[in-house]
C-alpha cells in the first residue's frame, strides 16, 4: 500500500489539477502517469449540465469506437431458431432462451453484453432486477434489442460501447487501454466527444459540458479542455 501511495504521489506531481489540458497532452499524461502492473483501461468522464429528471434531457446510447476498446467482450444472446443460429455464426459466446434465464437467476454473470430479439423480451424481462442495476438489460436505444443479431454481436465484439448519464449528469466511457498508441486513444476520445456534443438537449441551459476528464485504472484524473476536441 505504501508503495502504491508513493507511486500515486509521483503521478499527482506531474499533473496540474488547476489546468485543463489539450486532448493530446492529457492522453500523453495518462500514459506517463500510469503505474498499474496490468494493461490498464482508459476512461473518459463528462459532467453535463443537464436535468435527467426531464425526459428530453436523458442521454443514453451506444457507438462503435474507431479503434475498439481493447477489451474482449463476452456476448450473450437471447434468441431462438434461425436468429439463434445467426448469433452463433457471428461469434456470440452464449445463446439460449429459458435455460439462460434460469442460469442467470442462479447467480451466473460471466458475460459483458446482453442482446435479445424483440420476441424474447418477455422472458428477459424476468431478469430486470439482476440485469438492470448492472446496466446489462437489453434496450432498443443501445441497439441490443434487435432482429439483426449478427450485426449487434459483431459490433459488440468490435468495440461498441454504451453510455448513459446518471442522476447527476455524469457520463463515463471506456475508450481503450494504456497500451494503445496515443493517436488511437485521441481518435477514440474525439469520436466519443462528437457523440456527446451531438447529444446536447435543445432545452439544456448554461455550459453544457461542465467538466471533461480522462484517467486510467488506478490512475490520476486529468482535466481536458473540450475546445481541444
From Swiss-Prot:
Name the Pfam families for this protein.
Ribosomal_L1
Q: Which CDD domains match?
A: Ribosomal_L1
The record, for SUPFAM superfamilies, names:
Ribosomal protein L1
- GO CC, alphabetical: large ribosomal subunit
Q: Name one GO molecular function term.
A: rRNA binding
User: Which UniProt key words apply to this protein?
Assistant: Repressor, Ribonucleoprotein, Ribosomal protein, RNA-binding, rRNA-binding, Translation regulation, tRNA-binding
**GO BP: any one term:** regulation of translation
> Which superkingdom heads the taxonomic lineage of this protein's source?
Bacteria
User: Where are its TM segments located?
Assistant: none
Q: Which residues form the signal peptide?
A: none
What HAMAP family is this protein classified in?
Ribosomal_uL1_B (MF_01318_B)
Question: What role is this protein assigned?
Answer: Binds directly to 23S rRNA. The L1 stalk is quite mobile in the ribosome, and is involved in E site tRNA release. Protein L1 is also a translational repressor protein, it controls the translation of the L11 operon by binding to its mRNA.
Q: Which family does it belong to?
A: Belongs to the universal ribosomal protein uL1 family.
Q: How does it assemble?
A: Part of the 50S ribosomal subunit.
**What is the protein's given name?**
Large ribosomal subunit protein uL1
Name the gene behind this protein: rplA
Amino acid at each position: 500500500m505504501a508503495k502504491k501511495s508513493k507511486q500515486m504521489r509521483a503521478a499527482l506531481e506531474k499533473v496540474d489539477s488547476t489546468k485543463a489540458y489539450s486532448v493530446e497532452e492529457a492522453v500523453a499524461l495518462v500514459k506517463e502517469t500510469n503505474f498499474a502492473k496490468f494493461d490498464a483501461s482508459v476512461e473518459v468522464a463528462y459532467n453535463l449540465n443537464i436535468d435527467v429528471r426531464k425526459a428530453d434531457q436523458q442521454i443514453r446510447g451506444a457507438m462503435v469506437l474507431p479503434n475498439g476498446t481493447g477489451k474482449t467482450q463476452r456476448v450473450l444472446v437471447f434468441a431462438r431458431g434461425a436468429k439463434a443460429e445467426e448469433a452463433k455464426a457471428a461469434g456470440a459466446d452464449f445463446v439460449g432462451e429459458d435455460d439462460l434465464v434460469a442460469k442467470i437467476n442462479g447467480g451466473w454473470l460471466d458475460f459483458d453484453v446482453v442482446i435479445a430479439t424483440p420476441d424474447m423480451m418477455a422472458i428477459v424481462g424476468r431478469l430486470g432486477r439482476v440485469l438492470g442495476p448492472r446496466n446489462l438489460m437489453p434496450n432498443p436505444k443501445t441497439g441490443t434489442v434487435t432482429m439483426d443479431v449478427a450485426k449487434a454481436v459483431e459490433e459488440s465484439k468490435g468495440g461498441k460501447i454504451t453510455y448513459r448519464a446518471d442522476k447527476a449528469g455524469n457520463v463515463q466511457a471506456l475508450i481503450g487501454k494504456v497500451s494503445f498508441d496515443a493517436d488511437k486513444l485521441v481518435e477514440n476520445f474525439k469520436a466519443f466527444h462528437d457523440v456527446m456534443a451531438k447529444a446536447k438537449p435543445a432545452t439544456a441551459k448554461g455550459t453544457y459540458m461542465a467538466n471533461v476528464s480522462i484517467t486510467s485504472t488506478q490512475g490520476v484524473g486529468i482535466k481536458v479542455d473540450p475546445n481541444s476536441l
